[in-house]
């Protein structure tokens, strides 16, 4: 049941230093035996309290709005909004890819951003995918996990964030870095604090509605089949994030680099 939920669901010195610092911090937690894919939840009482508030807000406001949006907004408009939100995230993805040491992917991401922002009319249409520029989605939560010398499951302590939901130390710091280097946030806040907060609020609200509308069935199914919805969501989040980090490290991380070197040695 949790697996079904999981399935549905150069100039970067400062970010690199932050990644290294958090990776070292998480490395210090590596000795804690929490079991494979077992979340470390030392503040469970506080997390459950925040979860209950988030749950109430979801029942009263977010879910009903998401249902109306899904049922009444024309599908092309829904796709357009989703595309715009994805396009706004491309610059941060490109920066994260540079820090991860994959400049080729970063170049593709920037090309996607330029194509979709112009020909795609501010990102409404994903023209880039149609012409063979594949999408990747990165952030500094992934980047910290990529470099951290610990098992992918060890993202630090589990935390439930107000209005955001499941997270952990690694991903929480990653989100903070993402927000601090986002070019659109920097530009709008440089205009005025009012402009910055209006932009941030509008983008956050649109993201919440878009994401919630896309997870209605998955979350309903998870809750319906769970004895403890909090624990089920915590487990699903931890397993999903661990798998994402594991795949990243296996495909492009240190282990993959060693395998490439071994293959070259055999060829020679």
Where are these regions (language model features)?
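C-terminal motif of bacterial Sec signal peptides marking the signal peptidase cleavage site
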Residues: 25-28
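Surface-exposed, polar/charged faces of alpha-helical domains
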Residues: 74-79, 86, 97-105, 130, ...
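N-terminal post-signal-peptidase region of extra-cytosolic proteins
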Residues: 50, 66-81, 100-101, 108, ...
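Mid-length scaffold segments of soluble, non-membrane domains
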Residues: 87-169
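Bacterial signal peptide processing site
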Residues: 30-33
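Bacterial N-terminal signal peptides that target proteins for export
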Residues: 2-18
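A structured, mid-to-C-terminal "fold-capping" secondary-structure block
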Residues: 37, 142, 146, 150-268
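Post-signal peptide N-terminal segment of mature Sec-exported envelope proteins
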Residues: 35-61, 67-68, 86
């Amino acid at each position: 049941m949790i697996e079904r939920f999981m399935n549905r669901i150069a100039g970067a010195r400062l970010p690199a230093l932050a990644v290294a610092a958090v990776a070292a911090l998480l490395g210090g937690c590596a000795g804690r035996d929490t079991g494979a894919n077992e979340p470390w939840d030392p503040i469970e009482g506080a997390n459950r309290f925040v979860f209950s508030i988030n749950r109430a807000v979801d029942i009263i406001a977010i879910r009903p709005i998401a249902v109306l949006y899904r049922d009444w907004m024309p599908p092309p408009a829904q796709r357009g909004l989703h595309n715009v939100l994805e396009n706004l995230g491309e610059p941060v993805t490109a920066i994260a890819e540079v820090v991860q040491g994959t400049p080729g992917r970063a170049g593709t991401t920037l090309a996607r951003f330029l194509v979709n922002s112009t020909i795609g009319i501010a990102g409404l249409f994903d023209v880039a995918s149609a012409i063979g520029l594949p999408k990747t989605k990165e952030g500094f939560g992934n980047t910290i996990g990529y470099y951290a010398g610990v098992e992918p499951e060890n993202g630090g302590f589990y935390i439930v964030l107000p209005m955001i939901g499941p997270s952990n130390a690694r991903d929480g710091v990653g989100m903070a870095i993402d927000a601090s280097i986002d070019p659109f946030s920097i530009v709008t806040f440089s205009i005025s604090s009012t402009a910055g907060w209006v932009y941030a609020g509008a983008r956050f609200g649109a993201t919440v509605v878009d994401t919630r509308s896309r997870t209605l069935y998955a979350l309903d199914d998870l809750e319906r089949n769970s004895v403890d919805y909090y624990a089920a969501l915590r487990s699903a989040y931890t397993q999903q994030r661990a798998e994402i980090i594991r795949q990243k490290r296996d495909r492009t991380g240190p282990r993959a680099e060693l395998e490439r070197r071994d293959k070259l040695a055999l060829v020679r």
